[in-house]
């Protein structure tokens, strides 16, 4: 079973718990304020980050065709240059949509597992008809060609979040998404086998905690009693 197949069994909450408790990542890898505009069907999505950077239309770098090079089992991740991002709602400084239905059509044909846009998207019904998972900050109707262009693929993306912290997404990072949102697993900083083992044990423990609570044991007591075993997996 591949890393992606192992991780797809878990919710983003499970993964965040692992990143927080095993690797002391305070955010649990979570990116706030993204909405599942075209939600995943029945399960989590997991894939390898294929990153795309957008810059102002007058940027000297030439535009790149990113959509015809989407790798299989990837999550397409689009973001703006940091100076076009905002800490505050709506989290970006342009009103145009960066991504549309034809892009999802092509990405799905190339066997991408989903798309994350740190900006606006359009053609909502098309994404949903395709059952192609798409997460974004919001929606719009206008194409982006008058204001921004894609200038780089497989580059680091810097994401300004609403707590004022800048998070990084690297090409090849694992991206997971479900109805709770989007989580990044930093591949270069984590032992995936160790992370998966912790998550599996944590899920087992929480099932026991749930049963204890249903049988009348106080929640705090059940958590303390059951979760002590997890220390050996950290």
UniProtKB/Swiss-Prot annotation:
- Glycoprotein: is it a keyword of this entry? no
Q: Which GO terms describe its molecular function?
A: 4-hydroxy-4-methyl-2-oxoglutarate aldolase activity; metal ion binding; oxaloacetate decarboxylase activity
Q: GO biological process annotations for this chain's record?
A: 3,4-dihydroxybenzoate catabolic process
Instruction: Provide the taxonomic classification.
Output: Eukaryota, Fungi, Dikarya, Ascomycota, Saccharomycotina
**How does its activity get regulated?**
Competitively inhibited by oxalate, a pyruvate enolate analog.
Top EC group = lyase
Q: How is the cofactor bound?
A: Divalent metal cation. Has preference for nickel ions for the HMG aldolase activity. Has preference for cobalt and zinc ions for the OAA decarboxylase activity.
| Official protein name in the record | 4-hydroxy-4-methyl-2-oxoglutarate aldolase
Listed EC numbers? 4.1.3.17, 4.1.1.112
* Residues binding substrate: 100-103, 122
Q: Which cofactor does it need?
A: Ni(2+); Co(2+); Zn(2+)
Reaction it catalyzes: 4-hydroxy-4-methyl-2-oxoglutarate = 2 pyruvate; oxaloacetate + H(+) = pyruvate + CO2
Q: What does the sequence similarity comment in the record state about its family?
A: Belongs to the class II aldolase/RraA-like family.
One matching Pfam family is RraA-like
How does it associate, per the subunit comment? Homotrimer. Forms a ring-like structure with a central cavity.
Protein purpose: Catalyzes the aldol cleavage of 4-hydroxy-4-methyl-2-oxoglutarate (HMG) into 2 molecules of pyruvate. Also contains a secondary oxaloacetate (OAA) decarboxylase activity due to the common pyruvate enolate transition state formed following C-C bond cleavage in the retro-aldol and decarboxylation reactions.
Which UniProt keywords are given for this protein, alphabetically ordered? Acetylation, Lyase, Metal-binding
Q: Which residues carry this modification: N-acetylserine?
A: 2
Is GTP-binding among the key words of this record? Answer: no
Residues recorded as binding a divalent metal cation, renumbered to this chain, are 123
- Identify the stretch annotated as signal peptide in this record: none
Anything else known? Present with 846 molecules/cell in log phase SD medium.
